[in-house]
Regions:
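Beta1/beta-strand and adjacent pyrophosphate-binding region of the FAD-binding site
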Residues: 2-15, 34
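Conserved Rossmann-like nucleotide-cofactor binding loop
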Residues: 15, 19, 41, 217
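Gly/Ala-rich phosphate-binding loop of Rossmann-like dinucleotide-binding domains
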Residues: 20, 24-25, 169
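Glycine-rich FAD pyrophosphate-binding loop
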Residues: 24-47
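Dinucleotide-binding Rossmann-like beta1-alpha1 core, especially the glycine-rich loop
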Residues: 51-135
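A short, glycine/Asx- and small/polar-enriched loop/turn
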Residues: 105, 136-145, 187-196
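Helical element adjacent to the flavin cofactor pocket in flavoenzyme catalytic cores
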Residues: 149-209, 213, 217-220
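Glycine-rich beta-alpha-beta "Rossmann" dinucleotide-binding loop(s) and their flanking helix/strand
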Residues: 220-237
Length: 237
């Protein structure tokens, strides 16, 4: 069968559901949204397995500001979601990430990055080995030159709850979720736009636009459109 809508999202975990939510939140958007998710239990999704960590120690101002918006969204989730009293209050468990330099080159990178971060409004501190030892006496700092840490809006949060409420509100606003695995994409003759997706069931779904929100499988979906996307799943320890 074939059907038509404005937006199709391949992947329904936190990236797909947040995209669907933000589309429906935009007053200029009057289309329809369909989310295609291969596993509606999300048992093995990166969203489910993630520690939901957030940081601001980046080398570009844009990344810092994106993270700051994310932190504000977490801390004011109920407000962003329209004051819905069902939405719980969330916060960030601040502990900060400590980056350690054992070479002059990496120490200079930390200094350069701190300038970018401070200019963007982050609270990054640079620590000498003695300062690191004073804060963390159990560390051996003999081979260290410099440390970098930010303990404001840097730590972890309850990402599962945020995901659940993005998804719940998206569905309440008319976003449709279907179970299926995208196995092929069909592009227009010029190869500039995806016109339809084919599911493992054989169903063909027409697209106005397709959003690749497949997470660690994003490279596989992109390859169906002839795009080499440098995404690969890696286990974090």
């Amino acid at each position: 069968t074939a059907s038509s809508a404005v937006r199709r999202l391949a992947g329904g975990a936190i990236m797909g559901s947040s995209t669907a939510w933000f589309l429906t939140e935009n007053p200029d958007f009057n289309g329809s949204v369909l989310v295609i998710e291969r596993d509606p239990t999300y048992e093995c999704a990166a969203t489910t397995l993630s520690n939901s960590c957030i940081r601001q120690q980046f080398s570009t101002a844009l990344n810092v500001r994106v993270s700051q918006f994310g932190a504000d969204f977490v801390k004011n989730l109920r407000t962003y979601l329209g004051g819905d009293e069902r939405v719980p209050a969330l916060g960030i468990r601040n502990f900060g990430y400590l980056y350690l330099a054992d070479s002059d080159a990496f120490a200079q990178t930390l200094r350069d990055n701190q300038r970018v971060q401070l200019a963007a409004g982050a609270a990054t501190e640079l620590l000498t080995p003695d300062q690191i030892k004073a804060r963390y006496p159990y560390y051996n700092v003999d081979d260290l030159i410099l440390g970098s840490i930010n303990t404001r809006d840097e730590g972890y949060f309850d990402g599962s709850t945020m995901f659940e409420w993005w998804r719940r509100q998206a569905r309440e606003r008319g976003v449709e979720y279907v179970t299926g695995e995208v196995v092929a994409l069909t592009s227009n003759p010029a190869g500039t736009r995806v016109e339809s997706v084919t599911l493992a069931s054989g169903e063909v779904i027409a697209c106005g636009q397709l959003v690749n929100a497949a997470g660690t499988r994003g490279a596989q979906v992109a390859a169906m459109a002839g795009i080499a996307l440098p995404i690969e799943p890696r286990k974090r320890y």
